[in-house]
């Protein structure tokens, strides 16, 4: 990955940060994005001279265009895109507000469309590109209270398979990494009883770690994975067996 330029959205903390750090450790120059200047500064601090943090609103097409122009001017064309930014707006469908549906779709699915599309011209010209979209186990299993989130993550899989077929002949791979239950800030607030309930369904007997996802992303971004495309790599300790 030496000399490659990677863009990782939503990399202030958790899985996104682990991905950014893993790619930079492999030699890539990583641009990580945050929704605020403070977040971008934090990314720049942990990446040091191996990358830079920048502000991006993934739901705003103009923000995306501005960011990509800045990256091109300052660093060059992007070789590796990791669409990691995502949110949750959980609710039972009967109670779900329209904005809870549309916010999820804009952030978790439409942003993948906009960013991936923006990469294609330069990647096709170079005949090289890696697009890695972060999905979720619930995109395959479903989850009550998350019809919006599950639909978006399932959509990411369908999008990735279709795009993979469109661009494979130009040396571009498009894959999904689908995490199971990963130990992050969000799982820290769970009670011991809630954690035990989750772990009872995980054959591996533990929550995953952010580095487990980062290692999977780094593999798919590498030259070793050049013949793998349109695939969903499930990283979930056996919670879901595809």
Curated annotation (Swiss-Prot):
Source taxonomy? Bacteria, Pseudomonadati, Pseudomonadota, Gammaproteobacteria, Pasteurellales
Pathway entry:
Lipid metabolism; fatty acid biosynthesis
Look up and give the organism this protein is from.
Haemophilus influenzae (strain ATCC 51907 / DSM 11121 / KW20 / Rd)
Its protein name is: 3-oxoacyl-[acyl-carrier-protein] reductase FabG
Name the PROSITE patterns for this protein.
Answer: ADH_SHORT
> Which InterPro entries does UniProt cross-reference here?
3oxo_ACP_reduc, NAD(P)-bd_dom_sf, Sc_DH/Rdtase_CS, SDR, SDR_fam
Question: What does the UniProt function comment say about this protein?
Answer: Catalyzes the NADPH-dependent reduction of beta-ketoacyl-ACP substrates to beta-hydroxyacyl-ACP products, the first reductive step in the elongation cycle of fatty acid biosynthesis.
State its Enzyme Commission number(s).
1.1.1.100
What quaternary arrangement does the UniProt entry report? Homotetramer.
Which residues of this protein are catalytic?
A: 149
């Amino acid at each position: 990955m030496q000399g490659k330029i990677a863009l990782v959205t939503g990399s202030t903390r958790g899985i996104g940060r682990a991905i950014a750090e893993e790619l930079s450790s492999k030699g890539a120059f990583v641009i990580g994005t945050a929704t605020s200047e403070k977040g971008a500064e934090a990314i720049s601090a942990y990446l040091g001279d191996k990358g830079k943090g920048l502000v991006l609103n993934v739901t705003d097409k103009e923000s995306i265009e501005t960011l990509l122009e800045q990256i091109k001017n300052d660093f060059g064309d992007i070789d590796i895109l990791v669409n990691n930014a995502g949110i949750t707006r959980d609710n039972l469908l009967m109670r779900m507000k329209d904005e809870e549906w549309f916010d999820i779709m804009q952030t978790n699915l439409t942003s993948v469309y906009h960013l991936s599309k923006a990469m294609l011209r330069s990647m096709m010209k170079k005949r090289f590109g890696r697009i890695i979209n972060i999905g979720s186990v619930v995109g395959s299993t479903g989850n009550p209270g998350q019809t919006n989130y599950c639909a978006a993550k399932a959509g990411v899989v369908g999008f990735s398979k279709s795009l993979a077929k469109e661009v494979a002949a130009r040396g571009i791979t498009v894959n999904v990494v689908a995490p199971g239950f990963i130990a992050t800030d969000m799982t820290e607030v769970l009670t011991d009883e809630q954690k035990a309930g989750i772990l009872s369904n995980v054959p591996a007997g533990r929550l995953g770690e952010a580095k487990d996802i980062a290692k999977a992303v780094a593999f798919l971004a590498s030259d070793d994975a050049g013949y793998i495309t349109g695939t969903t790599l499930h990283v979930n300790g056996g919670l879901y067996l595809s």
